[in-house]
Amino acid sequence: MEEPASADPPRIFWKSRRRSASANGRSLQQELNKEAADEQLNNQAHEEAMKIDDANAVSTDDDVHPDPKANLSEKRKALFEPLEPINGKRSSAEMLLPPPDFEPASYPKGWLVGKKRKLVNVDVVESMRRIAIQEMNRKDREINGLNEQLEEDSRVLELLQKQLADERKKRTEIEKENSMLHEQVSMLMNMLDENEAFDEEGEAPPPDTL
């Protein structure tokens, strides 16, 4: 029998395997890098979408609550100014009047209405102030008249009190005179009674003569 021919050992290509392993490692690294890049792109897209949503929400809030003075001109803003200044000083009616070279055609209608409304308010306040001053003056005149009448009444009362004191004094003097006259009359009556008694005793006849 012939000996079987020894089979050649399989060739192992170490270099080719190393190359394939390195190629597989590079492909994995590329895939990882690609996934990281895709994730970063997705995050950026998500952030941009969030920013767009926030901007839309802010614009929606602005649309829901618009600022009334945002798109107004200076002439329109005059309508929202208060009638009285903030510092407390009252502005005169002349300051609120339109300028001498006032042309209604060059101003919006609302501004004219607002200025007229301000002027009407000033006129009403001024008329109320004049009425209040007239009422205060009338009350002052009434108070002055009452004070004068009170002073006159006090003078009359003092005069009456003086007259009453004089009358009381006179009455006291008259009462004293009356009492003195009563005493004198009583003395005279006693003297007359005594004289009559003496006369009767003198006219009576003695008993021996009979």
UniProtKB/Swiss-Prot annotation:
Main location: nucleus
Coiled coil segments of this chain: 29-49, 129-184
Gene Ontology terms describing biological process: flower development; regulation of flower development
Keywords: Coiled coil, Flowering, Nucleus
Tissues/organs with expression: Mostly expressed in leaves, seedlings and floral organs, and, to a lower extent, in panicle, roots, nodes, internodes, leaf joint and sheath.
GO annotation, cellular component aspect: nucleus
Disruption phenotype: Slightly shorter plant. Early flowering phenotype in long days (LD) but not in short days (SD).
Annotated region (Disordered), positions in chain: 1-97
Comp. bias regions, Basic and acidic residues: 45-54, 62-79
UniProt induction comment: Follows a diurnal expression pattern; levels increase after dusk, reach a peak before dawn, and damp rapidly thereafter.
Location within or outside the cell: Nucleus
Segments crossing the lipid bilayer: none
Summary of the function given for this chain in its UniProt record: Regulates flowering time via a photoperiod-dependent pathway. Suppressor of flowering that upregulates HD1 and down-regulates EHD1 in long days (LD), thus leading to the down-regulation of HD3A and RFT1. Triggers OSK4-mediated HD1 phosphorylation.
Assembly, per entry: Interacts with OSK3 and OSK4.
Name this polypeptide is given: Protein HEADING DATE REPRESSOR 1
Originating species: Oryza sativa subsp. japonica
